[in-house]
Each structure stands twice: as C-alpha cells, then as structure tokens.
Amino acid sequence: MSGLFETLGRRALFAFDAEQAHGLSIAGLKTGLVTGSAPNDLALSVKVAGLQFPNPLGMAAGYDKNAEVPDALLKLGFGFTEIGTITPRPQSGNPRPRIFRLVDDKAVINRLGFNNEGHDAAFKRLSQRAGKSGIVGVNIGANKDAEDRIADYVAGIRRFYQLARYFTVNISSPNTPGLRNLQARDSLRELLSRVLEARNEEGKMCTLKRPVFLKIAPDLANEELDDIAAEATEQKLDGIIISNTTLSRAGLKSAGGRDETGGLSGAPLFDRSTIVLARMRERVGPDMPLIGVGGVDSAETALTKVKAGARSRPALYGPDLSRPEPAY
C-alpha cells in the first residue's frame, strides 16, 4: 500500500513543473503534520567534527533554501539538515525555467543561481527554533554582484554563528559565474584564512567552535584536488563535502533537457562524485571528515560512499536533493 501511495504522490508532483513541485513539497512540510524524529539507535550514531549525529544520513543544502522546514525534515528521520545556500542579500536567481527533469536518467539539471531570501529572512526563521534539538547547518554563499565575494562568506559566518551547528562554504555551484574560481589555490587560501579567522573570533566570544566544511565540485582535475587538500590540511579545515553538481553530460540517455546549461545531479552524479571522494581521502589522510553527496538513493549507494571516504572515521552522506524523487 505504501508503494501505491508513493507512486500516486510522485505522479501528482510530476503533473507540475519541477520548481512548482519543489515548492509544493515545502508547503506540505510547513503544515506541521509531520511527526516523529530521527532514530535513536546508538549503532547509527556518529561523531564528526565534534558533533554527535543521531545517524549519518542528512538532507543536503538546496532543498530548504530559506530555512522554512528544518524541524520537519529532522522529524522525517534525517540525522541532520542543511539550509541554504544563503547569500547576504536576497536574489532571484536565474530566469525560469531553470530546473529540468531527466526522467530516464533519474536526474535533473538546474541553473537556479543561488535564489534565496537572504540573511535577514533565514536569520529570523532560525531564531525561532533557538534552543531546539537537532543539527541544522547553514550553507553560505556570495551574491552574484558582490564586489568582494569572500566578504560575503565572512558575513555569513558572523551572522549565523549563534544559530548554526556547522557551516558549509559553497564555492562550487556552476550557476554563479566565476564562483568556482575560488577553488583555485591562491583564492582558496585567502577564502579559508578569512572565513576561519571570523569563525575563531566569533567562537572566542561565545566559547563555541562551529565546524566549517568546504563544498567542492566533482569536475576538478587531480592537480586541483592536490591544492584543495593541501590548503584544507594546512588551515585545519573541519571537513570537505564532496560534491556539488557536475557540468558533465557523459552517458545521459534522456533526449529532452540534456542540452540545458546548469549543474547535473541525481544518479549520473554518483560515480563521478564517489571517485572524487576516494581521491580526496587519499590526499587528506584518514582523519579529516569527508561528507559524500551525490546520487545517494539507497542503502547500497550510501554504503559505497562510506567505503570510498571513510578509512578510519565515518563519512556522512546526504541525498542529492536535486534528483527527481521525492521533491521534484
């Protein structure tokens, strides 16, 4: 019977375009009808970067962009959830349509462009859950027209420091022109230095040290992975999230939509992101936490992520929220 309801629900959502379906799923969670909590099983619990997660499956950024339903997502059983990407000022993102289903590939292409309501709106919503349990991270980004993009990331750290359990620095979206250039070593060195300095200053004032993770692209060459690993290690970054969406279209079967610009996610991202996860583990050694994202849709794919990235410490993994099920 549950399979029937799942099929009917999926068909109903597919009657709308992808972005409308996403909005409807958020609206459904906002009704407050979701009950429950993450499983309280010590066998599933994992400690990473000083945080005790009830289980290692989390909701990646990109679904709850504006911090509208973090607690509803935690009630669904996720061990953590990540809001954003949030930029200092609101921005509308790229023109619609900007999400394209590739049904035969169990994937989508999106070129949203960090559409979000900005720091103020997210801060107000997160303030309303102050004191509640559950790990909610904040994924921070830069406005498209920012003169100093690194300053936007620093602003995100300072604004949300009291409310975020951890931060993700997103420099890997392909939908903001020039953003991925921050992954180059010289730019990355300055970015991490300024962001971690802000984190350390805020931490001293409230005696709390929030972990900072870096989210990278799956399209990096080995030399670029070398540079990122070196900077992350040298600056004592808390962890790396692997990966964002890909620009590759290799092996796609779907005819419609495959030529649209934007980042590809879903099942076709799984192999590429998992390979990069394994390569990064080789570079950073056994101790740095790595978080695997991309194409996770089953226990088997989740376990593969863990095997690729978890040598001596467990890896966290998050479902790729741009895949067509369930949100789109």
UniProtKB/Swiss-Prot annotation:
UniProt-annotated catalytic positions: 173
Keyword annotations of the record: Flavoprotein, FMN, Membrane, Mitochondrion, Mitochondrion inner membrane, Oxidoreductase, Pyrimidine biosynthesis, Transit peptide, Transmembrane, Transmembrane helix
Residues binding FMN, per UniProt: 61-65, 85, 139, 170, 215, 243, 266, 295
Residue stretches spanning the membrane: 21-38
Cofactor: FMN
InterPro entries for this protein: Aldolase_TIM, DHO_dehydrogenase, Dihydroorotate_DH_1_2, Dihydroorotate_DH_2, Dihydroorotate_DH_cat, Dihydroorotate_DH_CS
Catalytic reaction annotation: (S)-dihydroorotate + a quinone = orotate + a quinol
Principal localisation: mitochondrion
Subcellular location: Mitochondrion inner membrane
Pathway this chain belongs to: Pyrimidine metabolism; UMP biosynthesis via de novo pathway; orotate from (S)-dihydroorotate (quinone route): step 1/1
Membrane topology designation: Single-pass membrane protein
UniProt xrefs under CDD domains: DHOD_2_like
GO MF annotation: an example: dihydroorotate dehydrogenase (quinone) activity
Cited function: Catalyzes the conversion of dihydroorotate to orotate with quinone as electron acceptor.
Protein name: Dihydroorotate dehydrogenase (quinone), mitochondrial
Species this chain originates from: Cyclocybe aegerita (Black poplar mushroom)
Gene name as annotated: URA1
